[in-house]
């Protein structure tokens, strides 16, 4: 009985093992597990794509809002400049009327009144410009940058006006 040697029994064991694997539907379970994993990966990819698109939409929206804010800031600055020009023109007109009405006064009093009027106009223009700059900086910069820029601007305004 040569066919009853160890090789034969190993072969029979292999055949029985393979039959058991097929009987227990292991290949089907493996295929189902792989299909489930593929579905999970597909769902994760779809979710990632959806999140990316949502992020793109948010980015576009925030860029639009930033542009609107910049345009509004530019409008505010332009309005402040126009108002400063009007105030300057109005102050100049008042100063000229004051000087014309007071020609009988001495030359020293006229010069003193002009100096005071110019300082008042400059002070009002500086206050308006600083307020506009504060508004713009409050919208655009963080606290540290705002503080630094404000300090520099005030120093420059003081040196130029004095």
Swiss-Prot record:
Annotated compartments: Cell inner membrane
Membrane topology: Single-pass membrane protein
Family under the similarity heading: Belongs to the ATPase B chain family.
Keyword tRNA-binding in record: no
Biological function: F(1)F(0) ATP synthase produces ATP from ADP in the presence of a proton or sodium gradient. F-type ATPases consist of two structural domains, F(1) containing the extramembraneous catalytic core and F(0) containing the membrane proton channel, linked together by a central stalk and a peripheral stalk. During catalysis, ATP synthesis in the catalytic domain of F(1) is coupled via a rotary mechanism of the central stalk subunits to proton translocation.
Record keywords, A-Z: ATP synthesis, Cell inner membrane, Cell membrane, CF(0), Hydrogen ion transport, Ion transport, Membrane, Transmembrane, Transmembrane helix, Transport
Subunit structure: F-type ATPases have 2 components, F(1) - the catalytic core - and F(0) - the membrane proton channel. F(1) has five subunits: alpha(3), beta(3), gamma(1), delta(1), epsilon(1). F(0) has three main subunits: a(1), b(2) and c(10-14). The alpha and beta chains form an alternating ring which encloses part of the gamma chain. F(1) is attached to F(0) by a central stalk formed by the gamma and epsilon chains, while a peripheral stalk is formed by the delta and b chains.
Natural source organism: Rhizobium johnstonii (strain DSM 114642 / LMG 32736 / 3841)
Pfam families: ATP-synt_B
Full protein name: ATP synthase subunit b 1
Segments crossing the lipid bilayer: 3-23
């Amino acid at each position: 009985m040569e066919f009853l040697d160890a090789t034969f029994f190993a072969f029979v064991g292999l055949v029985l093992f393979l039959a058991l694997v097929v009987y227990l539907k292991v290949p089907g379970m493996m295929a189902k597990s792989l299909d489930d994993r593929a579905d999970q990966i597909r769902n994760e990819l779809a979710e990632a794509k959806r999140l990316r698109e949502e992020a793109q939409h948010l980015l576009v929206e925030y860029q639009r809002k930033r542009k609107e804010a910049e345009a509004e800031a530019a409008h505010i600055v332009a309005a402040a400049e126009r108002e400063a020009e009007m105030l300057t023109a109005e102050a100049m007109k008042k100063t000229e009327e004051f000087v014309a009405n007071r020609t009988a006064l001495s030359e020293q009093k006229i010069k003193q009144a002009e100096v005071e009027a110019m300082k008042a106009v400059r002070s009002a223009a500086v206050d308006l410009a600083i307020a506009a700059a504060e508004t713009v900086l409050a919208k655009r910069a963080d606290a540290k940058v705002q503080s630094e820029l404000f300090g520099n601007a005030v120093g420059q305004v003081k040196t130029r006006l004095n």
